[in-house]
Amino acid sequence: MRAKSKWLAIFLVLGLILAACGGDGGEEETTTTEGDSGATTEAPTETTEAPTETTEGGDMGEIATDVGVDLEAGTITVGLLSDLSGVFASLVQVIVTGQEVYWENVNANGGIGGLQVELLPVDTVYDIPTTVQRYEEIRDEVVAIGHSTGSPHTVAVNDMLQEDGMLAIPLTWYSGWSDDAINANLMHHGVPYCLEAMNVIGYISDTMGDATSIAIASNPGDYGLDSYNGAVMAAEALGLEVVYEGEGAINAADEATLTEVANGIVASGADIAWVTTSPGAFGSIFGQALAQGYQGVWSGANPSYNPALIAPDSAIKDAMAASSYWSSYPNVWGADTPGIQEATQLLMDSGRVDQPISAYFEGFVEAQIMHAALQQAYDNGDMTRAGVLAAAKSLEEVDFNGLAPNESYVGSNNEQVQRVSGTIFRPDPEALASGETAGEEVLETNYTHPITEAFEFNSACYSLEG
């Protein structure tokens, strides 16, 4: 496979996995050893109290541990619930590589108080029962879960996470991860689909100046409906009439539904079309509407887009460039920020990266959140699983240095929820063809529209039942 074809294929899988991510223990012994600080963070009450032993830890002050931290071996083990051989393996492997490169650099520079972080990835095959099985297999070996692919998959293990008092970082942008009714053991990151819709539709409306109507269509499930609900709220706040309602109407595997949605958008004559689905389904809907003369401005949740839509051999590349706007969660490859530049250098120096794929940065973001939690737990003197979770939930700010918008894990739902889109961009086929970037013309960075800023977030925009 030629290099350009190879990375376009990976980009295609990127869009597919991010869309599909929103598809439709007993007592533990706790050991205390010598460490830098005797202060401990109060652990969540869900965990079972366990007997405590004390051992000597050399120069470290008193450090409490239970599962996944071995002070004698000098290791911290973090699990990854990742699709490594299923339909989204090529993308998840990129994200896992990002984590591996990040932690290799941390370990080479002293680790966490001299402790080396070891990743334990297990293959969930993007299957809910397998995710549960893999969790059960590693639950007695890891201090936390640094990556969990898929919203329903993460919900399926959430009760066990709470039983174990264990932290996990989901790989989706469902707004429920910012809802304290759901997220006792989960760490959100990135602007949720719901608020992303407000940012992007607000930006498009302001840019157009004269838009009065919008067509909205989506996949079913948390991914599509979280975004759909955000688009409806954006329309109301902006005074846009919703002239086509395709709530959960898209089945990416059923071409008939794509045609029905395309026809509905065309018939509505909407000024703006917000379509949240997979990239392949988006391309089909876009192309069919274009062929019928539709001239509105397009967008959707970020997973609806990937650069394959503007590849040199794409029949819709020029129309996509002329009539669509998008957002990103982390920043993009080539962005002039310290965080992006540092991550890019580490990736290129690793010898495992030869194409500009921004998905690596997602691995860095996940790893940096876990790094902050582990470091705080170490500083607190409590590296039990409950201690790591408590430390994570005490983080007032995780600063990504421009890699992505900073995150906070204290305060109310409304105070914690991410409102900032990493970038607003337009597709750039010429830049993509050059092979030097992923084809984004960045229009705004760290963007928050006034309607998003004013939105009162108290609970998930869409209820995903476990």
Sequence positions of predicted segments:
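Bacterial lipoprotein signal-peptidase II cleavage site
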Residues: 22-30, 37-39
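Beta-alpha junction/loop-to-helix N-cap segments that form part of ligand/metal-binding clefts
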Residues: 63-66, 90-97, 109-180, 189, ...
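Extracellular/periplasmic periplasmic-binding protein-like sensory domains
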Residues: 289-364
